[in-house]
Amino acid sequence: MIAIIVQTLLISVSVAMDAFAVSIGKGLTVSRVRPGDAVRSALWFGGSQALFLILGHYAASAFSAYVTAFDHWIIFGLLAFIGGNMVHEAYEEDAENAKETAQFDWKHMLPLAVACSIDAFAVGVSLAFMATSVPFAILCISVVTGLFSAAGLYIGRAFGAHWQKPAQIAGGVVLILIGVKVLLEHLGVIAF
């Protein structure tokens, strides 16, 4: 039980890294962060993560009867791909992120929230095949993402772009490691 909670928390932090990195970028562009901006950011990113997790979970649940024999490979493949992509993107980002507009209306936040939640869809697919409480995972991931995005605004304002790349790399590596853990458990190499 504790291993499942820890795994869910690690996934939550990892999936939140895109929103955290984008929020740091937004924080770089403001002279001060208002509490309302932080709340809006948290709601946009956390809510979008929850929606995409639910969509991914239901999409996978519809096909779970057909893929249970190789679900561990799906989990591993998705998490390794998402994690690898996060690490790759951290090295590919340019000054464009730092110049992101600091507006917090729906026209600016919706595309960012959706872009940061694409990975959540794949994680939602993975949740359908993992031994975890899906409602708890969705709640945990969306709350952690909301908190990280709000904190990212303040961190971006205070410290600049220094933390953006390491956060994204760390999130990617953790997702890859969780994928490896799930694969090794299903293959009987390790037991948790």
From Swiss-Prot:
This is Putative manganese efflux pump MntP. InterPro entries: Mntp/YtaF, Put_MntP. The gene is mntP. Probably functions as a manganese efflux pump. It is a multi-pass membrane protein. GO terms for cellular component: plasma membrane. One of its GO terms (molecular function) is manganese ion transmembrane transporter activity. It comes from Bifidobacterium longum subsp. infantis (strain ATCC 15697 / DSM 20088 / JCM 1222 / NCTC 11817 / S12). Belongs to the MntP (TC 9.B.29) family. It is found in: Cell membrane. Its main location: membrane. Keywords: Cell membrane, Ion transport, Manganese, Membrane, Transmembrane, Transmembrane helix, Transport. The keyword Manganese applies. The chain crosses the membrane at residues 2-22, 41-61, 62-82, 109-129, 136-156, 172-192.
